[in-house]
Amino acid sequence: MQAQLKTKLAVFMFLQYFIWGSWYVSMGTYLSKTLQFEGAQIGLAYGAFAIGAMIAPFLVGLLADRYFASEKLLAFLGITGGLMLFALPMMTTFSSFYPMLIIYCCTFVPTLALGNSLSLRHLDNQKRDFPLVKTLSSIGWIAAGITLSVVFKGEQSAVQFYVAGTTSIIFGLFSLTLPHTPPMKTGKDVSMSEILGLDALALLKKPSFAIFILCMFLICIPLYFYFVNMNQYVTELGWEFSAAKMSLAQVSDVVFLILLPVMLSR
């Protein structure tokens, strides 16, 4: 049973990051070259993901904790997000594209935490098995870049959103095959601090966790410069298959995720 479960979770992770990798790396080039957006507008578009990360998890986390099974919520978010991705190419002005992108990000970002939570809840040996399952997320990102670049040559076209949208709908349907994961806090009172995630701030009292959060905060600053500008830059330099080449950076993720169970066992 665990072998079948790990296979399903690995496929789930692959699809999830294939969606993300299909559009996130090359969107800046599409917005710049095809829609002729200005630099500030492109920066705001990439900020939509951060807005989704700040808004959506609180509401979706509340729904998953108290009202809906995680796999059904993942299915709804995946299918809804897929339809929004199909709609994005129709939005050719910033005033229409940007709000739609924010709404889409509010459907995708919560799937990251929900998927991790579901996986950790069902795996018997989380320290050994979760990093190996998670390895498929990096492989999915790499596969998305290669597919977009080599198969579709789509860095500058709307095809990236169609690829991501199709995969998102498949992801949503596949989520229904995951183990039933009912809400754990049904019938319990809801506090405002819990909805806003303020209870989690208590974790910052642990020095190791506080240092980890600080490091992640600092790392994400240059990371966004990379995602917003890198694909446009190398495209201007005349690189072919730029999204595919950039995706190969995830090879380091694969290596370290494979090594993580060994490190955790020591």
Describe the residue ranges of each PLM region:
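Juxtamembrane intracellular "pre-TM" segments in multi-pass secondary transporters
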Residues: 1-3, 178-214
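Helix-loop boundary and gating motifs at the non-cytosolic
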Residues: 2-50, 208-248
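Helix-loop junctions at membrane interfaces in 12-TM secondary transporters
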Residues: 4-6, 89-101
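Residue-level signature of mid-helix packing/kink "hotspots" within the transmembrane helices
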Residues: 50-58, 141-142, 250-258
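Helix-to-loop junctions at the C-terminal end of transmembrane segments
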Residues: 55-69, 152-153, 256-266
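Structural signature of the two symmetry-related core transmembrane helices
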Residues: 72-86
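Cytoplasmic helix-loop-helix junction between adjacent transmembrane helices
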Residues: 102-136
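Symmetry-related core transmembrane helices of the 12-TM Major Facilitator Superfamily/SLC fold
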Residues: 160-177
